Amino acid sequence: MSDSKKPTPEKSKYPVNLLDTPFPMRGDLPKREPLWVKQWQDKQLYKKIRAARKGAKKFILHDGPPYANGDLHIGHAVNKILKDMVIKARGLTGLDAVYVPGWDCHGMPIEIQIEKQFGKGLPVKEVQEKARAYATGQIARQKADFERLGVLGDWADPYLTMNFRNEADEVRALGKILEKGYVFRGLKPVNWCFDCGSALAEAEVEYADRTDLSIDVGFPFADIDALASAFHVGADVLKAKPGWIVIWTTTPWTIPSNQALNLHPEIEYALVDTSRGLLIVAKERVEACLQSWKLEGTVLATCEGAALNGVRFHHPLAKMDAGYDRTSPVYLGDYVTIDTGTGIVHSAPAYGVEDFQSCKAHNMPDSEIINPVMGNGVYASTLPLFGGQMIWDANPKIVEVLRESGNLFDAHKYAHSYMHCWRHKTPIIYRATSQWFAGMDVQPNDGNATLRETALAGIDATAFYPSWGKQRLHNMIANRPDWTLSRQRQWGVPMAFFVHKETGALHPRTPELLEQVAQRIEKSGIEAWQTLDPRELLGDEADMYEKNRDTLDVWFDSGTTHWHVIRGSHAADLYDASADLPDGRLADLYLEGSDQHRGWFHSSLLTASMLYGKPPYKGLLTHGFTVDGEGRKMSKSIGNTIAPQEIANKMGAEIIRLWVASTDYSGELAISDEILKRVVEGYRRIRNTLRFLLANLTDYDHAKHALPTEQWLEIDRYAVALTDALQKEVLSHYDVYEFHPVVAKLQTFCSEDLGGFYLDVLKDRLYTTAPDSVARRSAQNALYHITQAMLHWMAPFLSFTAEEAWQVFAHGTEHTDTIFTSTYYNAPVPQGASALLEKWAAIRNVRGEVTKQLEALRIDGKIGSSLQAEVTVSAGESVHDALASLGDDLRFVLITSAAKLERAPEGGDLLITVVPSTHSKCERCWHYRADVGHDHAHPTLCKRCTDNLFGSGEQRSAA
């Protein structure tokens, strides 16, 4: 029958097989989904799935913990849904797919919340207690929202980095890497946020545009004889005029701390005579610099930077205050460039990594490094001229003093990309502080490879999805500085060291003491370190040592979850001894946003490399960020954010899930109201297809009605062969964590293969043949296998809908309770499947051409439905033979009342002729047939319908 209005059986004395199903047309997702969530919670579905997979090989997706603060945003939803789809897709293969969700609980954002609620100045122990309570409340809210999205996991026992066992094991991990020789203390410039009052991890730094003062500053000549020798000029030439070596900087606030100048050894530098005096700049920058300073000049001499090594120049503020009466030597550095500026870099070792490395390479002791900027961004009161001022406020004042000194050549505003704290969105600096580090290039005590070498080798042994992630992470590890492990915070796991008050050395029994502290933390949390009296562990030595007050970087918290979760708190579920084999890994997959190449992926790799000498994961999957329909980043200030809770309440979580699954996560994920409307339309097509399948299986019992494949009609064999071929593609996509091709192919299958062809052809047979006929049962056999396969394909992403349909479909089977304890369904593949696929592809091409002709006739008003038409097809040999094999069933495939087939002349094209039928319409099947009224007892029926209702039934062979 055509896909137009169906006859209503109750009004006809000639009924058709129109069945109903409890699976409704409308999903009513916002109302029904919470009921499913409640049902899954009540029946402990995750545990039930795990029990069904007992003894199977485990698949471990280790959860990168979200931070326990604030409401979920759409990025959280993307991440958790992707993880859920991976777990479900793997579980349906029969693996024991384990997912223990977790939360990152320590750190500055929660400290800030406690400060907002209770004010500053609370005792540390009280801050920790209140932070713990706050995080617990935040976790409860987020957990409910994650479950609402249909995400299955061990929500009853998630891992929390603030659980006592996890905190204790983190201290133990610190002890391990200390024993191995990776940890050291030193003065180094680190990313420093004034608002946090602490060092920042690399992953806590973001870049934003900022306008600063850019200045060109002259350092007056001091070592005339050395300069004369370098440039091969007479000393009298240099004494005849004032002279400067000129630097360019965008950080005027660092000038008071200048201690050296950096030149490239191989760049040529020019001595230039100008009306203002003698100047030294890179030869290639002379023209640009003179133009900028509105000077004319002549190059007197040149020399390579190497010739100026060690030459000294006066500090530009020396004339303004005796506190700056010092000279700055030239040090050579390969990092100096001549793209901008003067080709000379001023070096303040306390405030730049390369500056620091350069000065340390020239044996500058820590005690001589000038470091007047305090942790809050204010100069120490002892700094001449600028003491007590905030560095940003001091910038213009420094410029004025330099101008007054006669050493300023230029000052103007300069827009550039600059480091900011990701939490406070405020500018940060490099600041030399005494910190604890994990050394990237330190030789460990066992004499094996350095941390950098081990981590880079681990990257090569890791699978990346998408593949470009490998090079990205490689570059980050290859170029990163030592890891600053210490933080100056309160709500964090302590670096529980006892440090000698005079020498700063660690207690010689530190590994043993760390274990004793860990045992206390395991009983009562990190608060135990605050209340611990050193005498309890050190006895009479206590007066010689003090407790280290630093806490561990929160990236060490989450970066060691492979140690304190997989091997620790949740080892019973997550740990497999095979992970300890040389090629073994603790987790099959880590899955996070692309920012985690410098975050969790990064810290986890470093900690595992130190602890085990290899990565903790077999594979890394990276997804992009969410943007709006115009490609803009989600931002509250723009007003383009979309809350997942609102979508779930308005459209259903299933729509979010389908959106995530249908989007290529390797790039940006665009979302908008318009995009979601299209997702809803796609969902309806899938749901309507399911409803049709389930309705037409209402009176089908596979145990009673299954037929051997050789008894199926040919088109049914084709449909199942097509389903099997598609399943192979679907599973191959799932195997490499690809979801959007699965959705695209499922939608094509529903709309084109099923709705646009097979089901359209099938309706006549399903509705009009005898209920228990082979023709109808053959169709139902095919529908049964198609439905079962299809429900499993969609279960990873359309979890609510698949489960709802499964309750209808699988009633009375061993897996009635849930689809998720079953596995992907392998339908019986008919013999000669590949030949069937090829043959029916040709038949469908012909049908497509016939449909075009029918549509043209319909537009002309000559027919209404396609059943009002009769068609003649003239085809070449191979196509003719394929069509001829269908016999009279060809008309059912073309959905016309009659179909005639002719053989085209050799080499002739496909020719289709369509004409309106001149016959009467059968009341029951709506076909226009010459035999309507052949039986006077049933004048409105065709012969086929009288046979199906009152006789032995029609015979079908192909369709």
From Swiss-Prot:
ATP binds at residue 636. Its cofactor is Zn(2+). A motif ('HIGH' region) lies at residues 66-76. GO terms for molecular function: aminoacyl-tRNA deacylase activity; ATP binding; isoleucine-tRNA ligase activity; tRNA binding; zinc ion binding. PROSITE patterns: AA_TRNA_LIGASE_I. One of its GO terms (biological process) is isoleucyl-tRNA aminoacylation. The keyword Cytoplasm applies. It catalyses: tRNA(Ile) + L-isoleucine + ATP = L-isoleucyl-tRNA(Ile) + AMP + diphosphate. The keyword Cytoplasm applies. Monomer. Catalyzes the attachment of isoleucine to tRNA(Ile). As IleRS can inadvertently accommodate and process structurally similar amino acids such as valine, to avoid such errors it has two additional distinct tRNA(Ile)-dependent editing activities. One activity is designated as 'pretransfer' editing and involves the hydrolysis of activated Val-AMP. The other activity is designated 'posttransfer' editing and involves deacylation of mischarged Val-tRNA(Ile). This is Isoleucine--tRNA ligase. It comes from Ralstonia pickettii (strain 12J).
